[in-house]
Amino acid sequence: MGVRVFSTDHQATSWRAQWLRNLNAMPDADAAFRSLHAFVTPLGFEYYAYTLRTSVPITRSHAVSWSNYPEAWLATYAARGYAECDPVLQFCQRGVSPLLWPQADKVGESDASYWADARACGLRHGWSQTVRDHRGIFGTFSLARSTERITEDALVVVEPEMIWLAQLVHATISNLVVAQLLPDAAAPLKDVERRTLHWTAEGKTVAEVAAILEMTERNVSFHIQNAVAKLNAANKTHAVVKAALLGLIPAIG
């Protein structure tokens, strides 16, 4: 597989520390993604991709992708509308287990054309991993190559590094774009506003929240309305849903 394997914990720690320093120095998401080439090659792969999906707005969530995939594949992917039925993204939305791309003889009928086109464009063997963070952002990181099948024995050696890289890529790139894609994730909610939304999310009425937090119903309504405004929500229900999906509740303490 042509991968770099570390013989000691100290070597692995130094390697990861260097990656962290390099990525943390990147000025934007595009630069951070381009820099991954130097990290991916030692793992034995030619191609890599990262797709970020937000959890809000629920009916029109944002999706942004970066890749160094062959131009032929990017053109085919767009022309055939594979974004709507991508089996990699569909699998990765259902969980966070790594996905080893299927071999030609193990592809389901519904996905046959997708994988045939991918292989024809040089993406013959690959692996994908999804990471989900506290803001409800999903990030799917993929590694691929045109030759040499990825064996189970090889994965035992290198997959821990691949999983760690997926987590690092997600943390780095999502942090660089979150202010643009999810400005409400940084909504300056006060602790009392979080607590009122927290108990509202549990189905409590204003009167019940007031009793729990030992304040007047008027104050509860006041704090909820402030939270609605800060989250750019349409109403109380919308604010609770957004706060939950963005990891702003439950309130701690």
PLM features per residue range, with description:
Residues T205-H238:
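Recognition helix of helix-turn-helix DNA-binding domains
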Residues V192-T196:
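The N-cap/first-turn positions of alpha helices
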Residues L52-T76:
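GAF sensory/regulatory domain recognition
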